[in-house]
Each structure stands twice: as C-alpha cells, then as structure tokens.
C-alpha cells in the first residue's frame, strides 16, 4: 500500500473562513478521497496558523487574549470543514505544544548547520504578508499582494537564515525533479525568481510577542513563516522516530500567492536540516469576483454558510471544482454572475442530468423487473461502436470515461475528472433515448435486450457514483444506497463484482431537489 501524505496551507487565524479557504480544502479533500479509492495509505492534514502580528492586533482590537481568540476561530473553521465533509486525519494548530517543540528542534538543527546568525534589518515590511520586502518587489511603493496596505519602513535586530546559500541547490533540485513545483507555470515563476539570486531572511522578530519563543533567546519570537511552515513536519511527529513513517509529503497544496515561501524558503530550511523535500508542491489559482474586489454587501452574498446552504455541501463542492480549474484563476464579473452560474450548473448537471438518470433507471427497474436488477455482465471485449449487443456501447463509454477520469485525477486536474464522470451521465441519458426500454418492455422477445439495457444503466450509475465520490461523498453514497448498494462504494476496479441485486423501497424525496421558485 503506497503512502500518500497530503497537506494544505494552514489557515491564518485573523478572520472567518471564506470561499478561498473552502476551494483549497475541497480540492485537497477530493485528492485524498481519490487516493483512498486507489487503495493508498492516505494521511491528510489541515490546520491553523495562529501566531503573528495580525492575530495579536486582531485579538487586542476585540479586547481579547490572543489564545482565547484563536481558540474561537479554530472552532469556526472546524465547524465549516465538518459541514463540507473534509476528511482530514489531523488538524494541526501552531499554538499546540507538539508544534512548538518541532519548531524549536528544527531551528536548533539549522543553527547547528551554521545557517543562523544575528544582524540588523533595515528595509520594508508588508503587514498583509507579514513579510519583509525588497524595494524591487514593490509596485508603486506597495506590496503587489496587498496594494491597499501601507508598506512600513522597519529597522530591528533579528536572527537571520542563510537563504542565499541555497540558491544553486534549489535550482538543481527543481530542474532535476520536474514534478516538484506544479503546475508548470508556477515552476517557471520560481526558476525566474531564483535567477535573480536570494537574500538572507529573518528567522525571528523582536517586536512581536505573540509567537513561539526563539530557541536560546526569549527576547525574540520565531518569525511567523519560520513558525508556520514546519507544521508539515510537526503534524507527523517531528523530531521523533514516528516522523519517518509519514514523511516526506507526497503533496503540499497551497495558493499561488505563497509559492515563494513553500518553493524557496521551506525547501531551503529542509535542506539545511538534512530533511528530505516533499515530492510535489501544487499551487492552485483563485476563484475571484471582479478581480477580488468586493463591497461589504457583495461579501455578505458570498458568505460561506449561505453558499453551502444554497444547494447543500455536496453541490457546493461539485460546482466550485467544476467551474474553477485547479491550475488557474476563475474570475466572475459580478457576484450575481457567480450565483447564477452556481444555480445553472446545479440544475443542468445535477438536478437534470444525474438526478433524472437515477430516477429513470430506478423507476424502470421497479416497473419492468419488480425492483430486481438484471444480472447481465458487461462484455469486456466490447467495441466502441456498440454493434455487438445492446448495452455494449454504454459499458464501453463508461470504461473509457473511467480511464480518462483516473488520468485526470492522477494529474490533479480535478475539473477534468468531473467532466469525465459527467460524460458517463450524458452517454447514459442518450443511451436511454436510443434504446427505448419502454418499447422493449412491450415485446416478449426482447427480454434479454431489456435486461442488458437496465443492467448497463446500473453499471453506469455506479461508475458515476464512484468517480464523483471524491467531489460529492454524501450524494454519491446516497446514489449507491438508492440502487440497493450495501456498505461503502466499490473501488474503481471492483465495480462489476459489487453491483446491487435489488432496488430498495421507493423514497419520496429527490436526490437533487430544485429550489422553490
């Protein structure tokens, strides 16, 4: 069984969860669920980044103790992830003792390697990034990621990390391991950044009290990124022996705005400490409205709870990942256009195509076979023309779509995985129209043909449920149950041997209810 350690960026505890947080977690969860279907030993970690100046300032503005503040924020995030069916195995928080011990151990190891020294920093600081910035990185005197925030001039004595020493090793690793930074556009961005050389970076702050004490110097706290990045190893037991059982990570899932930290600083820290690098860092794009600029009233319309309530958590997961390619940005011109597309996609793909296919299939099996699913095996040698026998064309299309789905999911092209699954649904609906089971049912000589049609439709629905289960775990389990399936969904290669025998009693509710007009 292959090990697959998967992480997302930990969420900063200075506000409420929003659609951007959800997009990353849902995508990573789909990958985790797919890998479990493949039989991998998956360990999936998410969490909270709870230290730093912004958290301290936010808590103080509310008259709160920072620890009490982050405890409450963590509860909000946990509640949302539970509602969205995020199947994480661990939820790491940077205020936990296990994390702080790991940070201290890592810094001590880097220090023993001679890569920590003290110096005075003079330059610019972006409070939005909580990062020091070179003048060459600014656009019109502002941070390009936080153009509404004022850039601060700062001077303080800090501990520094010799990042500049790792430029050549980083380039060599990236060029030798093409999969290390994905998609390719992000890899090229990082290689371009490295061509200009690297400066050493601060590893501590002397003016921020809310953080992990810097090892050996309580007057300093660990710089927020030096604190946050090691969560990926603290969550799996670093520096204890159990750490080796899960590390290295197979995949770090992050947003495109933090590639510099994850593809330059983090691997350099690991190199210094003699720790193996993660296999892949995947930097996804953003889902945006009008380039990300929203009024307060527009932001309220995109409240995460309200969006999930609109059509339910599974539909939200499905539509978000279907509409937004995992490797690029998706920008909607207005909030209303996003909501309209959400509704249109829900009605077309789920209520109409998938929901109607399930309803038609179940109804015909009840009507024509008294609820018993015909035991007709798929023809493993069927050709794409479907000329050999009724049912062959749909079985062939389903198999081909499942191969396309598997290739897309292996490449983390999640929207293409969804499209492959929906190809089966469209093929199945067309197959019903072409084969006309209602006519076959009236012909006593067409019994075998009708059995083949109904059996192929059930296979197509089960295949669709398996393929869409990483995206809609609840609804796909319900499809399986409505077809008479028992226990968990079959794995992708075990569908034929797990087909149900009988459709259960009719239910009054529909799988994807249409909203009341």
What spans do the regions from the language model cover?
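Structured secondary-structure scaffolds
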Residues: 2-46, 98-102, 152-367, 419-421
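N-terminal alpha-helical segment
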Residues: 51, 300, 397-402, 460
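Long, amphipathic alpha-helical stalk/connector segments used for oligomerization, subunit docking
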Residues: 325-328, 332, 336-351, 361-380, ...
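Basic, alpha-helical terminal appendages of large translation-related enzymes
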Residues: 1-3, 43, 47, 119-124, ...
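Generic structural concept
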Residues: 351, 355, 395, 399, ...
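A short small-residue
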Residues: 9, 52-59, 86, 328-340, ...
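N-terminal, positively charged nucleic-acid-binding surface of large information/translation enzymes
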Residues: 1-180
